Amino acid sequence: ANAAEAVGARIFEQSAAVSVQDGPPSLVHTAKGKLRADYVIHATNGYHSSLNPSQAAKVMPINNFLVATAPLDRPQEVLRKPIAVADNRFVLNYYRLSHDNRLIFGGGESYGARFPKDIFAKVRKPLCEIFPQLADVPLTHAWGGTLGITTRRLPLFARVGPQQLTASGYSGHGVALAGFAGQVLAETIAGNAERFDLLSQLPTPSFPGGQSLRGPIMTLAMTWFAL
């Protein structure tokens, strides 16, 4: 956001888009006004809405959670080297040490709009499965966020309309992939759509049940695979 504002972009928070009309120019309608643009980018990832129903059926929002322990007296017993680790479970766990020897641990997911009341308890269970010696170590911080996944865990690049583009469904790898997607979208708007057109050919099936029933069906499936 700071980088965008530094080159002249204006950001309007709490201004939800209620409809998008293709152009040229494209029109984005809000409750109190409208914006004109040569291109509209749908960059809502796990927050897809009725503005883009065909793509919302292909990107499932899930919530992921992390905790930080108190500084560890013997961090080398947890990780011998300063590396980040992720396992290969269907609902994966991932962790690393911070500069002040806290264990930053991510694990546990939920589906739908609600977060668990106690994120500490949600994440402590998988943490203790991997590191039982940390069962009595205090957890000092807990947080979470909503991301978007696809059925094949590959990002979704698509043309929503002649002058509407979308990139989403980074499936837990958005720190790296979202920046790359931004470059590809910028290239496309500037007139070079070669990489966008290539990536848009990646098959991205809709989730069973579409946008309305994907949540309950996905919850059952993820619970089964997590066993």
Residue ranges of model-derived segments:
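Active-site substrate-recognition segment that forms the wall
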Residues: 17, 34-73, 77-162
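Thr-Gly-centered strand-to-loop micro-motif
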Residues: 30-31, 106-107, 167
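Hydrophobic residues embedded in beta-strands of well-ordered beta-sheets
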Residues: 26-28, 102-103, 164-165
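Helical element adjacent to the flavin cofactor pocket in flavoenzyme catalytic cores
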Residues: 1-38
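Active-site-proximal alpha-helical segments within enzyme catalytic domains
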Residues: 2-3, 38, 43, 185-187
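Hydrophobic/aromatic beta-strand patches that form the interior of the parallel beta-sheet core
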Residues: 12, 41, 165-167
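C-terminal catalytic lobe of FAD-dependent flavoproteins
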Residues: 109-226
